[in-house]
Amino acid sequence: MANTTFSGPVRSENGFQQISKNATTGTVTVTSGDKFAVEATGSAGIEGTAAVYVTQVNRLKSDVDTNVNIVKSTIMIDLTDLRDGGTAGDIIGKDGDGVAFIAQVTTANQGTVFGVTMTCLETPAGGGTDIDLYSATEGTGVNDTAIGDLTETQIINAGAASAGTMVAGGDIAADQYLYLVGQGTGHAAYTAGRFLIEITGYDVAS
């Protein structure tokens, strides 16, 4: 496919997507500008009434020398109407309303992860403010159950969150589901609380 150069502005009403095309089958795959390949569905146990749950995956094109893409994956979530658990270490989510993972990290979608940050954009209220990020092999965790019941790894130990706090964490293994985990002891509904989770990875350009 030939390259095209534009001298004026290029506009798109609904955004841009980067794709790859299989030379044999012709199958087109969106590689950048799309949501997580595996994210929470509309009826899942992690979307609160504020309905602010957005994921985005973008690949920054490599240079010809390294042939490696930087992959930036972002999750924005509002905790309003979600609940923390009754015990420290319980999964945050909707009360009795399905699995509560926020996304799945895969090598094909996020690349090899080498860094994660979690920024608090709005101070949590109603529920506890000590909220951590975990990964787990299983995508079956629900609200008010222990993250320790899953095959889990703590990614970010955030401590008490308030607007403007940002905490960095370690890498995330392939094919892991992500959960927000409360460290409080109440089972209260959140009335506020917004977080931005940013995952940085890399993969070899195809």
What spans do the regions from the language model cover?
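Surface-exposed, low-hydrophobicity beta-strand/loop segments enriched in small/polar/acidic residues
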Residues: A2-S206
